[in-house]
UniProtKB/Swiss-Prot annotation:
Pathway: tRNA modification; tRNA-queuosine biosynthesis. It comes from Staphylococcus epidermidis (strain ATCC 35984 / DSM 28319 / BCRC 17069 / CCUG 31568 / BM 3577 / RP62A). The lineage of its organism: Bacteria, Bacillati, Bacillota, Bacilli, Bacillales. It is an enzyme of class 1 (oxidoreductase). Belongs to the GTP cyclohydrolase I family. QueF type 1 subfamily. Gene3D superfamilies: 3.30.1130.10. Substrate binds at V79, E80, S81, H98, E99. Keywords: Cytoplasm, NADP, Oxidoreductase, Queuosine biosynthesis. It is found in: Cytoplasm. SUPFAM superfamilies: Tetrahydrobiopterin biosynthesis enzymes-like. This is NADPH-dependent 7-cyano-7-deazaguanine reductase. GO terms for biological process: queuosine biosynthetic process; tRNA modification.
Amino acid sequence: MTQGRQKDELKDITLLGNQNNTYEFDYRPEVLETFDNKHQGRDYFVKFNCPEFTSLCPITGQPDFATIYISYIPNIKMVESKSLKLYLFSFRNHGDFHEDCMNIIMNDLINLMDPHYIEVWGKFTPRGGISIDPYTNYGRPDTKYEKMAEHRLMNHDMYPEKIDNR
């Protein structure tokens, strides 16, 4: 029989269930929290769908809106979802290009969790008649995940969806 999480396993989770959280508008990677992966002997994907991402254009200061998809194969640590929500919210006043935001998010999550594999895909709403959908991924070097990352990158978005203003 599988047991649930014990209190000592949750000691580093401070944001989930906390009604006194503040929503910071400036980039704050330190808000991210992790917990242990109890299934380290198994490969599996964890996917976050984040439909309310907002950042700022670094030139005009205009807001950019996106749905972000974060998928990863955990190793030892996993990101706690409320901390991820607060982290993504912290991009609200962050001025950067779409491509930079996706790579920053991926790099922060790699530094936090050291996953086997991770990919971050942003689907931004159009501005000026053009939507931008940056995709970035990473597979642990010298492992099957490195080959997986290369394969997924080379085959990414081969059949783009019909865009009807998102």
